[in-house]
Swiss-Prot record:
Entry annotated with the keyword Cytoplasm: no
Its job: DNA-dependent RNA polymerase catalyzes the transcription of DNA into RNA using the four ribonucleoside triphosphates as substrates.
Lyase recorded as keyword: no
Family, as annotated: Belongs to the RNA polymerase alpha chain family.
Protein name, entry field: DNA-directed RNA polymerase subunit alpha
Catalytic activity: RNA(n) + a ribonucleoside 5'-triphosphate = RNA(n+1) + diphosphate
Main location: plastid
Coiled coil region boundaries: none
Domain description: The N-terminal domain is essential for RNAP assembly and basal transcription, whereas the C-terminal domain is involved in interaction with transcriptional regulators and with upstream promoter elements.
Source taxonomy: Eukaryota, Viridiplantae, Streptophyta, Embryophyta, Tracheophyta
Region listing for Alpha C-terminal domain (alpha-CTD), in residue ranges: 266-338
């Protein structure tokens, strides 16, 4: 009787945090373990959790900046050390925490000379600045500067559209991703049919939430995704014959790819390929070749991809289709096509 109770208890899934540290105000790290799992379950959970951590958790960013003193994005203003473009990039890096729904307004109103930091941002009580020491600009002359800001809570990423500045309002690339990175690893133990697995999950965040908070939110989001399968099947949904057909678009290489990579390099580093809805086989081939982000992928040509072990022309077409559909970009056929 006692032996049976012990056997049952060892099969109860348990998780715990085995390491937690704060490297800086904008870099938190956590390492978690989940066990015991049956063979294959650790990879299933690990892949799903990583995708949810990187793509399903909402974050808060500054998405627009507006000032009457800014003639255009690449101008310089007398009395300010930084160019307008540099100021916008500094605003992009500001880490915010909020329970905001949608958007809200904030502002910076200062009189020089002064070193403007994140603490000078006047924001609603629902928005908290994680690191008030983050640098924005340096005013070297005695004049007034007011910048209007738009703050938004969302998920994923949004690249600004070129030439969309209106009335002195400039869009800023937004990376609504509080989780900087997430990795999982698997440890197997036992013999034969009794083999079990331990899942290790590592999470890095930008300080707007802790790794444990990120783990909880990602788990809730995954549960919400699966809940519909617990309900009765809808019987009155009729699909047309052509609704399940996918037509691959005609692919052309855009000459602006190199320019796109250079201009959006930071944002592209934070777009991981497992957010691109690639089939698991295609994703695993890319992963084994150290292609982890969209920037890594854009540095390859179609010819490079075909050199990857077990990578087929069908896989290349899938990659091209997703790049064209989601980002309106393409890969060159070879290194000399651009």
């Amino acid at each position: 009787m006692l032996r049976e109770e012990v056997a049952v208890s060892t099969r109860t899934l348990q998780w715990r945090c085995v390491e937690s540290r704060t490297d800086s105000k904008r870099l938190y790290y956590g390492r978690f373990v989940l066990s015991p799992l049956m063979k294959g379950q650790a990879d299933t959970i690990g892949i799903a959790m990583r995708r949810a951590l990187l793509g399903e958790i909402e974050g808060t960013c500054i998405t627009h900046a507006k000032s009457e003193k800014i003639p255009h994005e690449y101008s310089t203003i007398v009395g300010i050390e930084e160019s307008v473009h540099e100021i916008l990039m500094n605003l992009k890096e500001i880490v915010l925490r909020s329970n905001l729904y949608g958007t809200c307004d904030a502002s910076i109103c200062v009189k020089g000379p002064i070193n403007i930091t994140a603490k000078d941002i006047i924001s609603p009580p629902s928005v908290e600045i994680v690191d008030t020491t983050q640098h924005i600009a340096s005013l070297t002359e005695p004049f007034d500067l007011c910048i209007g800001l738009q703050i938004e809570r969302n998920r994923g990423y949004r690249m600004k559209t070129p030439n969309k500045a209106q009335n002195g309002s400039y869009p800023i690339d937004a990376v609504f991703m509080p989780v900087r990175n997430a990795n999982h690893s698997i440890h197997s133990y036992g013999n034969g049919n009794e083999k079990q697995e331990i899942l290790f999950l590592e999470i890095w965040t930008n300080g707007s939430l802790t790794p444990k908070e990120a783990l909880h939110e990602a788990s809730r989001n995954l549960i919400d995704l699966f809940i519909p399968f617990l309900h009765a099947e809808e019987q009155d949904i009729i699909l047309e014959d052509n609704q399940n057909r996918v037509t691959l678009p005609f692919f052309t290489f855009h000459d602006g790819l190199a320019k796109l990579k250079k201009k959006n390099e930071i944002a592209l580093k934070f777009i991981f390929i497992d957010q691109s809805e690639l089939p698991s086989r295609t994703y695993n081939c890319l992963k084994k070749s150290n292609i982890n982000t969209l920037l890594d992928l854009l540095n390859k040509s179609q010819e490079d991809l075909l050199k990857i072990e077990h990578f087929r022309i069908e896989d290349v077409k899938r990659v091209l289709g997703i790049l064209q559909k989601r980002f309106v970009i393409d890969l060159p056929k070879n290194k000399f096509s651009n």
